[in-house]
UniProtKB/Swiss-Prot annotation:
Localization annotation: Periplasm
Record Pfam families: Cu-oxidase, Cu-oxidase_3
Gene: nirK
Protein name per UniProt: Copper-containing nitrite reductase
Family of the protein in this entry: Belongs to the multicopper oxidase family.
Originating species: Cereibacter sphaeroides (strain ATCC 17025 / ATH 2.4.3)
GO cellular component assignments: periplasmic space
Processing after translation: Predicted to be exported by the Tat system. The position of the signal peptide cleavage has not been experimentally proven.
Binding of Cu cation 1, residues: H126, C167, H177, M182
Sample GO molecular function, one term: copper ion binding
Signal peptide coordinates: 1-31
Amino acid sequence: MFTRRAALVGAAALASAPLVIRTAGAEEAPAQLASAAPVDLSNLPRVKHTLVPPPFAHAHEQVAASGPVINEFEMRIIEKEVQLDEDAYLQAMTFDGSIPGPLMIVHEGDYVELTLINPPENTMPHNIDFHAATGALGGGGLTLINPGEKVVLRFKATRAGAFVYHCAPGGPMIPWHVVSGMAGCIMVLPRDGLKDHEGKPVRYDTVYYIGESDHYIPKDEDGTYMRFSDPSEGYEDMVAVMDTLIPSHIVFNGAVGALTGEGALKAKVGDNVLFVHSQPNRDSRPHLIGGHGDLVWETGKFHNAPERDLETWFIRGGSAGAALYKFLQPGVYAYVNHNLIEAVHKGATAHVLVEGEWDNDLMEQVVAPVGLTG
């Protein structure tokens, strides 16, 4: 039984020596695999992708240029300290060093082949659970690796949509690893590309990936956020905050202000921008202040017709959604979680800087502010 005590003992032991921790799913999976018929994919082309940090996406085609391919990805698990806010730090566990992990993009019917690396300097076992995958706990049962190990997982992308992936090493480790930064998104495009509500093809000029995450940083007796030297040192204090279900921070892309100022997203009038938004743990309500969702796949699944002209859409905890908007006016747009307390007080805000010419037909200041006259 994977108890909290076992988790703490394991975390402490890993600080000095590798410890093999396997879930029940991981133990059962190899036996099941041994009896499975082999699959020959040697005739399929291989495409190697270089992942990039969010909010950006790696090079990809919106419409598949050929039949199915094997998409090769590599991700390193990086444990490191990150700064959430001016006075708050997190001993983060990450995919490829970013919160969220990179956006992966393939086409329906393709294969995803991931090499997952847990470097020897890490202190924890990790794995990956793809919500887009079928079987073995989304791959979690086949990918649990200790520091100094790597594993290669291949799965077929059988469903089109945006899907969360996250670390799920078992028991109380699962939520702790997720709120410590270990989540991301994979987008599986239909082979013939996205379609609008009438089934007509649509394209985007830019895709931005916004990964929303909730964090639980404990405070000391003086009300100061605590800072730890490694993940396991802060485990017990962090879990105490997690159990309140009240986050200390709710942020986009790993930190308060990560997507504002120098990190603000950019577009031009006339650009069609696809916003992919994931939240592995809590519900969210994205809203583009000054704009709309022209086409919104609220559940993120592209074979369902998109909704149109939404002001605010809903992202269920543990899922990803997508919204397409054509910018019609220049200026600064705020993309927020429209629980405005979470946007303003917790940090769930991004900015989009749009260049272009103003259209007075859409909006005009008829009279500038003037003093009232008696």
